[in-house]
């Protein structure tokens, strides 16, 4: 798709502050202006308890992170060919669907697929409560 169309994903474009703030919970501090460059949020687990209203405690903006460079510059796709694609926005997915003549699944379709077709159970493995090996 990218090679065929020249499409540039949202993570490969500099973000717009107003668009970011509109997506965050009220009271969330704005990102540092120096971070408003092409990149994406990369999960960084906290090592201590953190306030839940500030996503910067567990997500870090990484310059240059994109579907081609999952953790930023220096990271690559080699060895991840069977992993889900990351750093793809809804806009990116819609552009791909339009190009491919397809559509995104509905919420119900996505949930059915995510559960592997399993219906009427509390968890994807059945009704048994989660254990350390099933979380």
PLM region descriptions:
Residues 18-135:
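Functional-site microenvironments in short loops/helix caps that host divalent-cation chemistry
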Residues 8-11, 16, 55:
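Intrinsically disordered, compositionally biased low-complexity segments in eukaryotic proteins
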Residues 1-10, 100-101:
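Short capping motifs at secondary-structure boundaries
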